[in-house]
Amino acid sequence: MLDKIPGQITCEDFKYFVRTISERAPAKRGISVRALEKFINTHKLQSHSVEDFISAVILPQTGNGKCSFASLFAEHVDKGPAAVPPVGAVTHFVCLSNTRKPPFSLVVAALVELEKQLFSADTENLSTGAAMYVWLDMLCLNLHEVTHRATDQPPRRAWEMEDHNIIADQVIEQAQEFVLFLDNWQNPTVFSDGPCLCELFFAQVSK
C-alpha cells in the first residue's frame, strides 16, 4: 500500500501508515480465510500479485463507497448452506510487509494452512464450522484514505510523532503471526526501501 502514495515515500508517510493501522487494528470485523480462498478461486485470481489484487479488485470495488473491502466482501461471496460466514469477529490480526509482488493466493494459502494447524487438534471446532477470521491490513483498511491523503491537510507537527515508537510497538504486539518473504538477492528490494526496513526492525525488536 505504501508504494501507492504519490511521490517519494518518506518516514512521515510510514508513521502515518502505522498510526492509521493502530487506530483501526482493534476493529471487530475480520474476513474468513476460507471464504477469501474461495473468492480467489471462483474469480480465477490465483496469478494476481498483492499489488494486482489491490489495483484490479480492491480499489475498483470500493471506489464508490470509499470504504474497506471487508465492508463489501460478503456481497461478493457465494453463500452455500454449509458455508462459513465470510465476515465475522476477528480472531487474528495480520499485517503484511513487503508482499507486493508475490501472488496473493500464496498469502491466503499460508493463512489457510495456519487455520488447519490451529484447529487440527480440535475436531469439534472443525465439525461445527469454526473458522479463523483475519484482520488483514489491505482488506480491512480504507485504502482510499491511506493512499490518497488530502493535499490541503496542514503539516503534522514534530511533537505529534514523538509517540511513533509507542504506537508501532502497540501495532506489532497485536500481530500474532509474522511471515517473512525472501527477496532475490540480486535485486534486494526490501533493503532499499526505508519503510520495509522499519517494519522488519519493529518485528525483530518486539519478539
What is each residue range found by the language model?
Residues M1-K207:
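The feature represents the membrane-entry module of six-transmembrane cation channels
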